[in-house]
Design a protein with these regions (language model features):
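Helical catalytic core of nucleic-acid polymerases
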Residues: 136-139, 155-162, 277-398, 402-403, ...
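Residues immediately flanking
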Residues: 8, 73-74, 132, 307, ...
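A short acidic (Asp/Glu
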Residues: 14-18, 78-86, 313-316, 420-430, ...
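Short glycine-aspartate micro-motif
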Residues: 3-7, 69, 302-304
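C-terminal, non-catalytic extensions of nucleic-acid polymerases
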Residues: 274, 426-640
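Gly/Thr-rich phosphate-binding beta-strand-loop-beta motif of the actin/hexokinase/Hsp70
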Residues: 1-22, 309-314
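Conserved "right-hand" nucleotidyltransferase catalytic core of DNA-directed polymerases
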Residues: 145-154, 160-308, 391, 399-424, ...
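Conserved DEDDh/DEDDy metal-dependent 3′-5′ exonuclease domain
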Residues: 29-142
């Protein structure tokens, strides 16, 4: 099916909707040079047109087997506005519905508001749609800012009763831009998300239109034939160990720790195997030391000991699958097929599609069982799986330390253990892995790590065997992309993080890295106000303030007359200001399309020292070095 993007703008006496169809050549659409030409193909419908309702419904409903109607947050807003127009409401009534969506408390403002209230939750029916906010968060403007698009907004007051032709033209211009932004965001980020959903539909015989309209979790529930159910043990806390792992766990974990996990859901931290080990709803996490550097050498090596498909495996081996799935064999068959296809040579396209579908089902099922709004909801089985996973993996970590001389656990996470061990003892580690697998039926993998700079369990830089660099956490996040996820991260002056990574991994001079970087996006930072704040201002050096958009993109400027950016709210009758975190003291807005800037001109205003000083902050760490079992302080990574 083809994608038809749309977006509404609503004012007291006038509404507007823009439709834009995805070009047949998607590479043409993603090339920003073609943005003006693409926008020229968009169709405008507004309430001034004598047959506006019929035109709107025609574009929404005609050829519904050909076009998927797509947009951002359309379930919560645009489809509701479309339904209000479909009901024959006049622009004033459509605005009331709009206001109730945005501020539900306004439903009690007038009798007409009360009458319109039920329609603030009713979507237009009988169409196939894809909401780009599904399995995501944040606003469209945030996505536009991160992707480098123009994030300027209309200055027209949406509560203005009598719009001029210039006002309408302005709203039309920005509405077209948001439709193009949805198209661009789909191609850059969400296309793979939709493709994966369609793969599930193809494999499990789910109608294509249902695939578009469902979130991943809802679609997986359909694939597994799950039926929402209630269970008498929803409030039960205590869990019991499966017979096959009971002896192993009690032999390799202190009984007090094991029973605390088994009989309580409260998070707690203990010291085991020289780690601070934290147990909680997010799984088990531990570190040997924060701010730790370790590298492999001829005698010692870093080794990742991972449980393969840990949570899907536990759902099968420990019988933790949501009981809303009437036939557990369906899940096991999917798991077995994925393993078989993973090792198959010369895969066909159908094999690849099956792999995609199987992976999505396996990786979504556990999390969906803990969401009370989903058909897979089974809270007892969800907490049981999580806590069994913590117990069994920690038991292995404890046994490794007790049985392998000198082995150090560098960190544990939800499905793996990073250990530092003598190379001659690797066969013993593998033997203990095999024992763990034999007891449980869960396979284990391992891979070699060359180096790790570990700030804490959630922030580290790692070089794997072969030179592949892995980053986790915000400390050295250097891209908006999140591989394996269809989410994007804010811009945080990536130039600094990239320079630090090059310094640590290659020894490249930080200043040289910063100066040589000509990617304008790497110098940008995004900042937003958040729902609890009323607005955003920039306060200049002379004390004046200028109101800004809710979401902005900035960089560090040499111009000292430029000031900080603040978000503000009313607190006990007074305005309360808070500085935007991690934003330059003197910053300039860069809310226009980043491709419209000339970097040679841009760099004349760029305060390079800000980014160099950020590097200093990122490297302001007293590193510990674990070398052949000995721990010492090292200054080998000092730069400043």
């Amino acid at each position: 099916m083809k994608m038809r993007f749309f977006d509404f703008e609503v004012t007291p006496n006038w509404w507007l909707c823009i439709f834009g169809d995805m070009p047949d050549d998607e590479s043409y659409a993603i090339d920003r040079v073609n943005e003006p030409a693409i926008k020229d193909t968009f169709v405008e419908i507004n309430s001034d047109m004598p047959n506006a309702r019929d035109l709107l419904i025609s574009l929404m409903k005609d050829n519904d087997d050909v076009y998927v109607k797509a947009g951002y947050n359309i379930k919560g807003y645009d489809l509701v506005i479309a339904n209000a127009i479909y009901q024959g409401f006049n622009p004033q009534q459509v605005k009331i519905v709009n206001d109730i969506i945005i501020n539900p408390a306004s439903a009690y403002d007038t009798k007409e508001h009360l009458r319109m209230q039920p329609f603030a939750k009713r979507r237009l029916r009988g169409i196939c749609y894809q909401d780009l906010l599904d399995d995501n968060d944040g606003s469209l403007k945030e996505k536009e800012a991160i992707l480098g698009l123009d994030i300027m907004e209309s200055e027209v007051d949406f509560n203005k009763e009598h719009l001029t032709e210039e006002d309408k033209a302005d709203l039309t211009y920005y509405c077209k831009h948001d439709v193009y932004a949805c198209m661009y965001y789909f191609l850059k980020v969400m296309k793979g998300y939709v493709k994966n959903k369609l793969a599930i539909g193809k494999k499990f015989g789910i109608a294509e239109r249902d695939c578009y309209m469902c979130t991943n979790a809802n679609l997986v529930a359909k694939a597994l034939g799950a039926k929402r159910s209630s269970f008498g043990d929803e409030e039960l806390i205590e869990i019991f160990l499966p017979t096959k792992i009971r002896e192993y766990c009690y032999e390799n974990l202190p009984n007090k720790v094991l029973d605390q996990i088994r009989t309580s859901t409260k998070p707690f931290t203990v010291t085991m195997f020289d780690n601070e080990v934290s147990f909680g709803n997010g799984g088990v996490h531990s570190v040997y030391k924060n701010n730790l550097y370790v590298e492999s050498n001829d005698e010692w090596m870093l080794m990742n000991v991972d449980a393969a498909s840990y949570y899907p495996s536990m759902l099968i081996q420990f019988e933790c699958l949501s009981r809303a799935v009437r036939n557990p064999a369906v899940f096991k068959n999917i798991f077995d097929e994925r393993i078989a296809l993973k090792h198959k040579k010369n895969k066909t396209q159908d094999d690849e599609d099956s792999q995609t579908a199987n992976k999505l089902v396996l990786n979504t099922t556990y999390g969906a069982s803990g969401n009370k709004y989903l058909d897979l909801y089974d809270p007892y089985m969800c907490t049981r799986c999580c806590r069994l996973g913590q117990i069994f993996l920690t038991a292995l970590a404890n046994k490794l330390v007790k049985n392998v001389n000198g082995l150090k656990v560098i960190q544990t996470n939800t499905d793996g253990i990073l250990v530092y061990v003598r190379r001659k003892d690797v066969p013993l580690v593998r033997k203990l892995q095999d024992e763990w697998s034999k007891v449980s039926g869960i396979n284990m993998d391992y891979d070699i790590v060359e180096k790790i700079w570990q700030r804490d369990v959630n922030n580290y830089l790692m070089i794997k065997e072969g030179g592949k660099v892995k980053r986790k956490g915000l400390w050295l996040m250097d891209t908006w992309e999140k591989p394996g996820y269809f989410l994007i991260s804010p811009l945080t002056a990536y130039a600094s993080q990239k320079a630090v990574i090059s310094y640590l991994t290659e020894g490249k001079d930080i200043v040289k890295s910063i100066i040589e970087n000509t990617n304008i996006m790497d110098f940008m930072m995004t900042c937003k106000k958040g729902p609890s704040y009323r607005g955003v201002v920039q306060r200049f050096e002379d004390g004046t303030e200028v109101e800004l958009f809710k979401c902005n993109r900035v960089y560090a400027s040499k111009d000292k007359s430029l000031g900080q950016i603040y978000k503000y709210k009313m607190y006990k009758g007074n305005i309360s200001y808070a500085k935007m975190p991690s934003i330059p003291e003197h910053c300039r807005l860069a809310n226009n399309d980043l491709e419209s800037y000339d970097f040679n001109e841009f760099r004349k205003d760029l305060d390079y020292m800000f980014y160099i000083e950020r590097c200093a902050d990122l490297l302001d760490i007293q590193w510990l070095w674990l070398n052949e079992g000995q721990l010492s302080i090292t200054n080998r990574f000092d730069y400043f």
